[in-house]
Amino acid sequence: MSKEVNEERTPRTVADVKEMLTKHSNGEIQRTIQNCITVLQNDHVLADAIRLNLLSERIDIVKTVGWPRSGKTLNDTDMKYILRRMEKYGISSEKKIESAIHIVANENRYHPIRDYLNGLKWDGTKRIAHVLHHFLGAAEDEYTCEAMKIFLLGAIKRVLQPGCKFETMLCLVGGQGVGKSTFFRLLAVKDEWFSDDLRRLDDDNVYRKLQGHWIIEMSEMIATANAKSIEEIKSFLSKQKETYKVPYETHPADRLRQCVFAGTTNRQDFLPRDRTGNRRFIPVPVDAELAEVHILDNEEESRTYIDQLWAEAMTIYNSGSYKLAFSPAMQEALQSHQQDFMQEDAQAGMIYAFLEDYTGDRVCSKQLYAEALGNTNIPAEWETRAICEIMNTGISRGDIQGWQAHKTAKRYPKYGVQKGWERVISPETGAEDFSEITDAEAK
């Protein structure tokens, strides 16, 4: 547990602190880590100044000190001033001073968002069901209410229980100027707890961009994703931790996620037609003309409203009576909303059209890639997987009738040994083009 740093301290002079330090037999102050700690904890400039921020996982200076600075995070300039201050005590070992800073910071750790949430007191007025209509003109219905509640509770749980499973993205869909990004920025309470800097998931520094943030906006990222990148986005959302180094540390370590992800888009067809399901993405249409107020009309009032929004969500969280998923009754509404925003599946249409005219008994994914989709190159694994999803989902939904996956691999003259699909009832044509293979050949 962190030590409280708000206790009243008796101001001590440099001479007072020197009396507290261990010394050699000749009276010279020992240059030990413990003496450094004693100075950091009792010097009137440095006492209570150094704390470990559990959100950013960086060391902060949280009070006014005797030099000009901006921001809270400890930086190189701060270190120079601290070293100079330590010289008043005859201590100049930078390595030991740095070690002492880490120890003192760790013993005085804090979490700014937890402190914020735990300090809220709800006034009893329900706002979760109303907020998206109030600021953004969303429908005021049960679906919108559940979508907002799931997102808020997921965000709370992520900071109170870092690394918890939460892979849902609330996606606001509407034209420019509605205030979608501004809503998420103000929802994050402080600007430093919000980020819209996540542009690419293959960036080597992508995980550092999560550090210290609570709500991260992914603007138009889903709308511009192809079949391969949407799988990467889904995999990224499902992660519960990252492994990387933070400043001042030598070794990489697991970092449990404390953030949630929000989507914003102007496109009505932003969702890919994902055969494996789009359960991670919760679309909510918004319309500025239907909003009661614009969120920036009176920013102070909007921020007060949002404080009470979080207070209401904390009351629900503390009750334990919630789930981070749609109720069974709302699952159909979710799927209906997702259908409204799905892209036209051109590949599925081309494959369906090909099968209508196709007279063979069997077909494989590589054949469909070449003959139905008109490609001449060798397909990547994700491309054949997408074709398999089109076929298997189409068969299970009844969109593709008269076909079933064959149980064993077959040899296709142009495409080698492949798993694929066969007609349930053969039209008595094309069977001579394929041959059964043995189990040994299929391996």
At which residue positions do the language-model features occur?
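N-terminal nucleic-acid engagement/recognition segments and initiation subdomains in replication
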Residues: M1-R127, E142, E146, N377-W382, ...
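Extended aliphatic helical segments
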Residues: V5, V14-V17, V39, V45, ...
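Residue-level preference for alpha-helix termini and adjacent loops
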Residues: V45, A49-L54, R58-I61, G66, ...
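Feature primarily recognizes SF3-like P-loop helicase cores of small DNA viruses
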Residues: K88-H111, K165, E192-D196, D202-L237, ...
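P-loop NTPase catalytic core of nucleic-acid-dependent motor ATPases
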Residues: I101-Q211, K366, L373
